[in-house]
């Protein structure tokens, strides 16, 4: 493992929408991220099920759409004081906060809260399921442009400069309208002085120095390579390797399997520079592990799904690759530290967890 190959962007993305996690739980996640040498915390703050950040001038967002979660579980939101605590805690741990409002898809919670985001003025019902791709902002709705500008201007103002605009899985958005809406979100961030991050579907609209996050290896990669040639930087989050909500095996109670199962060995056995054919190595900004919380309700749930795989993802982000024998031999000692912090973990096979 060579320190000289460390990536600049070493991140963890946490979904606080499908299930809500309060400030103290978010800070505990930060402690874990910092422990593993990560330097970015990406918080997914809006989706079909809920809206998690209070926005001045748009009280309906939290009044009508903050209490939703998957399966009807309790929701919640962060007010200005909560967000200040989160931001200060991140800074004190060497973490740059990267907040995300996901648009134009994944927007049922916003559409439910604000009649003016719907062309006919009729709000859809709240959503507690796990399907994706059915909701979208509409250019024709009277409040869309003002809403997009207001929420992203505020998010940029209260962030550390990086703002994620989403852009994924907009299956119900017509192509030209998608382009117009993505331009609307990105322009709002740029005009407010922020740096744009977006999911890979929005790669064609990114500019020099901005970042695209690659998550689905099954999608065509030409637009990502083309973006890299324009000077866009690439964050690698391949779902088959570092989506840490994937079940470890078929017997895992938590998690999902839409990208198969992901044991520790699969997270550890990959090389970022080989993920996308034709992608220049110098275009890779780094690696970001992700955890989506459809099935996770508590910090212990998060911890169990993150560990030990986050240790592997973080080592790849720091060093570029892993020597499995060396990594595996060191895990029992690392796990003793985890126990001191009150973290729980999956006892992946092939590791002598009781050694020492």
Predicted regions and their residues:
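Active-site neighborhood of glycoside hydrolase catalytic domains
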Residues: 110-211, 215-232
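Conserved, mostly hydrophobic/aromatic
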Residues: 12, 33, 97, 165, ...
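Flexible, acidic glycine-rich loops studded with aromatic residues
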Residues: 206-210, 216-356
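Residue-level detector of anion-binding/catalytic polar loops
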Residues: 39-40, 96, 195, 233, ...
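Feature activates predominantly on carbohydrate-active enzymes
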Residues: 1-134, 143-145, 149-160
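Active-site beta-loop-alpha junctions enriched in small/polar residues
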Residues: 17, 46-50, 100-106, 168-170, ...
């Amino acid at each position: 493992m060579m320190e000289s190959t460390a990536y600049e962007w070493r991140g963890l993305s946490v979904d606080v929408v499908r299930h809500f996690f309060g400030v103290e739980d978010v800070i505990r996640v930060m402690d874990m991220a910092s422990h593993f040498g990560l330097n970015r915390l990406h918080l997914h703050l809006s989706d079909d099920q809920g809206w998690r950040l209070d926005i001045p001038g748009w009280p309906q967002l939290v009044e009508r759409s903050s209490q939703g979660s998957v399966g009807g579980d309790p929701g919640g939101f962060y007010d200005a004081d909560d967000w200040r605590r989160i931001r200060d805690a991140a800074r004190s741990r060497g973490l740059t906060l990267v907040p995300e409002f996901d648009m134009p898809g994944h927007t049922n919670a916003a559409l439910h809260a604000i009649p003016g985001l719907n062309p006919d003025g009729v709000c859809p019902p709240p959503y507690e399921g796990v399907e994706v791709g059915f909701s979208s902002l509409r250019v024709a709705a009277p409040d869309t442009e003002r809403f997009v500008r207001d929420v992203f201007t505020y998010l940029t103002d209260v962030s550390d400069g990086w703002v994620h605009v989403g852009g994924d899985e907009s299956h119900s958005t017509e192509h030209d309208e998608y382009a117009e809406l993505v331009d609307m979100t990105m322009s709002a961030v740029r005009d407010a002085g922020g740096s744009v991050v977006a999911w890979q579907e929005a790669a064609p609209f990114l500019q020099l120095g901005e970042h695209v996050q690659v998550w689905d290896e099954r999608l065509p990669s030409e637009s990502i390579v083309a973006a890299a040639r324009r000077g866009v930087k690439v964050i690698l989050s391949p779902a088959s390797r570092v989506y840490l909500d994937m079940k470890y095996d078929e017997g895992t109670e938590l998690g999902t399997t839409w990208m198969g199962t992901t044991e520790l060995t699969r997270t550890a056995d990959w090389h970022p520079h080989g993920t996308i054919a034709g992608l220049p190595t110098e275009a890779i900004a780094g690696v970001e592990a992700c955890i989506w919380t459809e099935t996770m309700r508590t910090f212990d749930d998060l911890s169990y799904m993150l560990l030990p795989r986050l240790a592997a993802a973080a080592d790849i982000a720091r060093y570029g690759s892993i020597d499995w024998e060396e990594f595996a031999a060191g895990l029992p000692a690392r796990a003793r530290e985890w126990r001191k912090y009150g973290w729980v973990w999956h006892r992946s096979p092939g590791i002598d967890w009781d050694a020492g």
